[in-house]
Amino acid sequence: MAKYKRVLLKLSGESLMGEKQYGIDEKRLAEYAAQIKEIHEQGVQIGIVIGGGNIFRGLSGANKGFDRVKGDQMGMLATVINSLALSSALVAAGVKARVLTAVRMEPIGEFYSKWKAIECMENGEIVIMSAGTGNPFFTTDTGSSLRGIEIEADVMLKGTRVDGIYTADPEKDPTATKFHDITYDEVLKRGLKVMDLTATCMCKENNLPIVVFDMDTVGNLKKVITGEEIGTLVHN
C-alpha cells in the first residue's frame, strides 16, 4: 500500500542520458516511464520536474560566454524537451500525462498554475511541470521545491544516480558513509550538496521532506512509495 498520496518526483536531466554522453536514452526513458506507471497504478498522484543538464546548463553556458539570462532560458527550454520526451514515453506506456510550462508556449504545453496541476492529478493524469520557475538564476532543484510546496505534495522524491546522501561523494571518497535519515539543519551545517541552498531552505521552511534515492535501479521508486527504507530521508 502506498505511504504517500501525492508526490513530487524530481529527475535530473543527466539521468535521461543513460549510457550516452548527451541527449536522451530511449531505453532509460522507457524504464522510468514503467516505474512511474507502477506507482500511478497504486493511486499515487504524481507531479514531475525534470532538469535539462543532458541538453544544456545555463550556468555552464554563462562560463562559456553566454549571457546568464539567455543561458538560463536555454536551460528552461531543455527541460521542456525532456518533459515532452517523458510525457510521450508515459502515454506510450498507457498513462495519461500532461506537460505544463512555467513560461507560456502553447501548444507545446499548457501554462502552469497550481490549480491546473492539482486538477489534472486528481483526474488521474501525471503532471510534468517544465521550464523551472520561469525565471533565470533559479535551478530546477529550486523549481522542484517550489512546485512540490505549491501542489501540496507529501514528499519530494529526488531520483539520482546514487542511493542516498553520504558524508562525502562516494564516487571520490571510499570512506564515505551513508545517512539513512538526516535533518535539514544537519544538511545545512555539514554543507552537504543535496540540492542548492535556496531549494534546501525552501523545503525546510515549508516542511516538505525529501527522499534521495537511486532511480536507476528498477523497482526502487515503488519501494520508496510503499515505505521501504531505501535512500535517505531529509526532514525537520
Curated annotation (Swiss-Prot):
InterPro entries: AceGlu_kinase-like_sf, Asp/Glu/Uridylate_kinase, Uridylate_kinase, Uridylate_kinase_bac
Protein family: Belongs to the UMP kinase family.
EC number: 2.7.4.22
One Gene Ontology term of the molecular function aspect: ATP binding
Free-text activity regulation comment from the record: Inhibited by UTP.
Pathway(s) annotated for this protein in UniProt: Pyrimidine metabolism; CTP biosynthesis via de novo pathway; UDP from UMP (UMPK route): step 1/1
Superkingdom of the organism of origin: Bacteria
Keyword line: ATP-binding, Cytoplasm, Kinase, Nucleotide-binding, Pyrimidine biosynthesis, Transferase
Amino acids binding ATP: K10, L11, S12, G13, G53, R57, T160, Y166, D169
Location in or out of the cell: Cytoplasm
Protein name according to UniProt: Uridylate kinase
Xref: Pfam families: AA_kinase (PF00696)
Leading EC class: transferase
SUPFAM superfamilies given in the database record: Carbamate kinase-like
Function description: Catalyzes the reversible phosphorylation of UMP to UDP.
Organism: Bacteroides fragilis (strain ATCC 25285 / DSM 2151 / CCUG 4856 / JCM 11019 / LMG 10263 / NCTC 9343 / Onslow / VPI 2553 / EN-2)
Catalyzed reactions: UMP + ATP = UDP + ADP
Any GO CC annotation of this UniProt entry: cytoplasm
Main location: cytoplasm
Record's subunit section: Homohexamer.
